[in-house]
């Protein structure tokens, strides 16, 4: 299996070794933060092996979350090092050896607070959300984002990506496993930090989602948890609801059940047609998705026990 970094500016595993623990008078408490992800078939002792290795590497474990679903193991570890304790070569080499021994995929992503976040946009064919995000990029409203590419299972939105001078990647999605493998390879090559689903109309597998835990933002056309699924506007219209809304949320392995980041709604006027409802909803979708992306980029979201708190 493999181990590597997806953080721009940091390179792949195999960084310059630590410089020793001499006292640095100008910054005596400088720390480096990283996220480690572990994915593979479940087996005994994985958590112990990883945490013991991090202890030997003088890492401080800030948070750890692991789960097993249908025999598939995933773990995310938030770690930090004092500047003088971090030997990137040793950490990278050790994680690579553990990945091979455990037959798992292990990745480490270092976080640089001042670096812009590499963003991938995924969309299918509806342009309204993608155009709103691209417009915000052009106007400078998303200065903390570093837009890297637009990825789609169709080609309708390619001209819009090209007009914004972003690479457009087309991946057919008839075979989900193969498509996701290709998409993950592209995202890794572009060193993506987080993903925005601007009306991407394909369901992502747990194998994909686990690699970007709380780093995939989706917009859904209903006030979740009401009306999940692809026909939310029609369901709301047929049931005669008086208020219709949209929800931006993190993507999890359970469809439309991820932690909710932001919501907005509008009143349904008498005699309003389904077409009019969809048009009004799409405006809210674009605005609410952009709001969620801004909150994420400004690190104002705290996810705890499946809920999001704005900080």
Task: Give the location of each predicted region.
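Histidine-anchored nucleotide/phosphate-binding helix
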Residues: 128-141
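Short internal beta-strands
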Residues: 145-156
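A conserved regulatory-domain signal marking ACT and ACT-like small-molecule sensing domains
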Residues: 26-117
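Short, glycine-rich nucleotide/cofactor-binding loops
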Residues: 119-129
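Donor/substrate-binding cores of folate-linked one-carbon enzymes
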Residues: 175, 179-181, 190-311
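Adenosine-nucleotide cofactor-binding segment
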Residues: 162-190
